[in-house]
Amino acid sequence: MAPPRPDYTFTHEHLLGIEGLHPLDIGHILDLADSYAEKTRAGVRPDPVLTGKTVVNLFFETSTRTMSSFEIAARRLGAHVISMPIANSSVKKGETLIDTAMTLNAMKPDALVIRHSASGGAKLLSRKVDCAVINAGDGTHEHPTQALLDLLTIRRVKNRIEGLKVVICGDIAHSRVARSTTMALHLMGARVHLCGPKTLIPPGTETWGAESAGTDFDKVLKGADVVMMLRLQLERMNGSFLPSRREYFRYFGLTAERLALAKPNATVMHPGPMNRGVEIESTIADGPSSVITQQVEMGVAVREAVLHLLAGGKS
């Protein structure tokens, strides 16, 4: 963990995306998250900095993994947690996001964690409430805590981020993870290369900070320090993006043979959930190069840090 910066103060009221963050902000969050990760591994309970605080998880899209991670993080810090999956909310009865925001705001929560299918949903919510808003994924736009946990995992495994070659392969077009993680890695000095079928690479990836975006997975893997595979988000696809899953795996699936093209100590990542045999074979997902379970572990630590900073008082 880096020494504290006496001249730095975290001033953000919300975490809506990586866009708008400074490298010092990211470094500060990672340092605090690193300290929480170390406490957890040592079996030490963190200080209850959120005692008396209420955190509401408002998930318009289902995600057991992300919601559970935020719940555990908030409870570890002493917060009272209310989780509202869409199936149990009045949104099913026709209530709009703004109506929901105004209703929840009247209950005076200290933080709202939102996942929504519409890009910009978190930003809209932040304009209607008086508490901290944390974006847990908004459409194909951003997923900032996933990006931060990815960076924390990389930093702990590689002892640095700056200068690393990171290859992100898969469904770039529908992935908020690709966007957020690329921007965060770029801000911290990594060299990011995106890869996938031509139909799944959107225009404008250079504005995220990507050095390249192409279709030759074998070529871009050469010299890679980190390889991150992305899930095919079939639920977001309306057209014929792929000929078949088998064909996709043939050209873009991560196999032992393909991984050998990267550096010998290359690290394999995946934000989950995985489609084994589609974007990655099981021997790689479960092998010694994989840090997929560490990503889940670091997710709780990052969310502890974010909740601490936004709901527990900035430090």
Curated annotation (Swiss-Prot):
EC number: 2.1.3.2
Chain residues that bind L-aspartate: K93, R176, R231
Keywords: Pyrimidine biosynthesis, Transferase
Signal sequence extent: none
Catalytic activities: carbamoyl phosphate + L-aspartate = N-carbamoyl-L-aspartate + phosphate + H(+)
A cellular component annotation (GO) from this entry: cytosol
Superkingdom in the source lineage: Bacteria
Entry binding sites for carbamoyl phosphate: R65, T66, R115, H143, Q146, G272, P273
Gene Ontology MF term list: amino acid binding; aspartate carbamoyltransferase activity
Pathway it works in: Pyrimidine metabolism; UMP biosynthesis via de novo pathway; (S)-dihydroorotate from bicarbonate: step 2/3
Record flagged with keyword Transcription regulation: no
Subunit structure: Heterododecamer (2C3:3R2) of six catalytic PyrB chains organized as two trimers (C3), and six regulatory PyrI chains organized as three dimers (R2).
Family: Belongs to the aspartate/ornithine carbamoyltransferase superfamily. ATCase family.
Role of this protein: Catalyzes the condensation of carbamoyl phosphate and aspartate to form carbamoyl aspartate and inorganic phosphate, the committed step in the de novo pyrimidine nucleotide biosynthesis pathway.
UniProt-listed HAMAP family: Asp_carb_tr
Name recorded for this polypeptide: Aspartate carbamoyltransferase catalytic subunit
Phylogenetic lineage: Bacteria, Pseudomonadati, Pseudomonadota, Alphaproteobacteria, Hyphomonadales
